[in-house]
Amino acid sequence: MKKYDRGWASLETGAALLIVMLLIAWGAGIWQDYIQTKGWQTEARLVSNWTSAARSYIGKNYTTLQGSSTTTTPAVITTTMLKNTGFLSSGFTETNSEGQRLQAYVVRNAQNPELLQAMVVSSGGTPYPVKALIQMAKDITTGLGGYIQDGKTATGALRSWSVALSNYGAKSGNGHIAVLLSTDELSGAAEDTDRLYRFQVNGRPDLNKMHTAIDMGSNNLNNVGAVNAQTGNFSGNVNGVNGTFSGQVKGNSGNFDVNVTAGGDIRSNNGWLITRNSKGWLNETHGGGFYMSDGSWVRSVNNKGIYTGGQVKGGTVRADGRLYTGEYLQLERTAVAGASCSPNGLVGRDNTGAILSCQSGTWKTSGSLNGSYTNLGSHRGSFSGRNSGGSTLFIYASGGNGGSAGGACANTSRLQGYVGGTLISVNASNNPAYGKTAFISFAVPAGTSYQITSYPTENTSCGAGVFSVFGYQT
């Protein structure tokens, strides 16, 4: 190789490594931003839950809070109060991830003192960055989400509103959360607690539900479409178009040529609900249910999903598409790094919780950079090998002198490295004036062959060179 060509291989390798490092740094930044955003979204949900509990508390205790607040002096609601009254679960923490504590400040409306308004404010702890405040304000779903940037004013998401904290008798600092509960919001909360609505309210079935017995005072219920009940007790007759019954209807068995329609439950005390052919159970309203069309599978009608707040258990669970979890993946069985495994692609964990993956029939630590060096021996002329491992193999060769020819040949050297038949690295000197050795290194992808050759002079008059080889692999 000519003198002015020396170093190009090293320069190209260095440039490639620099590009890889830049890409890794860029990707790490993107991942960090994603993790931060998910954390802020979680915080926003917690604030929404807390605010919803405070709203319900105010609605339940509207009259009491009217008596303990003025237009300038607030009634303060704390997390402890919400937990003690059952509006928050007992496990709800007093502070958020930044050590900030939520409180609701309830005051009378200045224009109409008979009505209440409130501001939920966080205080103490470590301030959130502005980026987090803006994100959380937009993600808060109960009330009007906002934030405090100057320590004095609450500003709404997208700067849609701005209110001085002093209007609510609240105090906080910059980098904190604020949620506005308007007069209309709290009036609705008060109405929710003590009214039985005559009309359906979308998303609020509780407003059409009785929570105690109702006494009709011997008056009638007229124009009823259907009466659905668990039991019925009648002091007189039950009259219908097709039959009159003074007691229970009992029978050993019944046969019907067409349909059986029941206005209530169909119950079996000690038997099965048996169907034949490819039929099963169907919910007519929503078009879902279960059936069997072969001897192996219980199927969902119309490919409906199955939803439960409990546990789904089976010998194996298979997803033909993606597998999602809204929380964490718990791997109960442990494996040992370095032990054999099958098939490749399995994911497990060791007894410390570190993730392992099955690679080339061996459990390996995910992302591990620990490797080992292997002495691949001393060779003359050429050496061929293959990377049979599951990760990149790094080859290091030194020497390349034609010492057996003696004289000037002992001072010349040459090493050439090939990967998959392509020349990757060269280091050579034909100057016989002084002694020297050559050194080359190159990477070999998994499953790829490689070769090292050593013939010190271009016309090979000095014969084959002697060199040593080492390999490094994770």
UniProtKB/Swiss-Prot annotation:
Residues 362-474 are annotated as: Variable region. Residues 1-361 are annotated as: Constant region. Keywords: Plasmid. InterPro entries: Enolase-like_N, Shufflon_N. Pfam families: Shufflon_N. Disulfide bonds: none annotated. This protein is expressed by a shufflon (= clustered inversion region that works as a biological switch). The orfs of this region share a constant N-terminus, while the C-terminus is variable. This is Shufflon protein A.
